[in-house]
Swiss-Prot record:
Entry keyword set: Calcium, Calcium transport, Ion transport, Membrane, Mitochondrion, Mitochondrion inner membrane, Transit peptide, Transmembrane, Transmembrane helix, Transport
Record topological domains on the Mitochondrial matrix side: 1-48
Alphabetical list of Pfam families matching this protein: DDDD
Compartment annotation: Mitochondrion inner membrane
Mitochondrial intermembrane-side positions: 77-90
Functional description taken from the UniProt entry: Essential regulatory subunit of the mitochondrial calcium uniporter complex (uniplex), a complex that mediates calcium uptake into mitochondria. Required to bridge the calcium-sensing proteins MICU1 with the calcium-conducting subunit MCU. Acts by mediating activation of MCU and retention of MICU1 to the MCU pore, in order to ensure tight regulation of the uniplex complex and appropriate responses to intracellular calcium signaling.
Gene Ontology terms: cellular component: uniplex complex
Name by which UniProt lists this protein: Essential MCU regulator, mitochondrial
Highest taxon, organism lineage: Eukaryota
Gene Ontology biological-process annotations: calcium import into the mitochondrion; mitochondrial calcium ion homeostasis
Length: 90
């Protein structure tokens, strides 16, 4: 998508001040065929709840393990030690 937006700019820089030689309209080769007709809609892969769970749950577990290890490291090296004085809700 970025290349299709840069294509007219590059052509204009190469050709200089001769904009009548180049079309500065958008180039959408992913939507239209060379003859100008619309391409058929691409096949959609179903994204089921099982795939979602198999993707999200391991990420959450890995993130929790990393956070736990970092918290233990900080507490062991006395970089951050939670104090009981912060729990004053009265």
């Amino acid at each position: 998508m970025v290349l299709s937006r840069l294509n007219p700019i590059v052509k204009q820089c190469v050709l200089g001040n001769r904009p009548n030689l180049v079309s500065l309209g958008p180039v959408r080769t992913a939507v239209y065929s060379k003859s100008g007709g619309l391409l058929p809609e691409p096949h959609r892969t179903s994204f089921g709840i099982i795939r979602l769970i198999l993707t999200v749950v391991p990420g959450l577990l890995i993130g929790a393990a990393i956070s736990k290890n970092i918290a233990n490291f900080l507490e062991e090296n006395d970089l951050f030690v939670p104090s009981d004085d912060d729990d004053d809700d009265d």
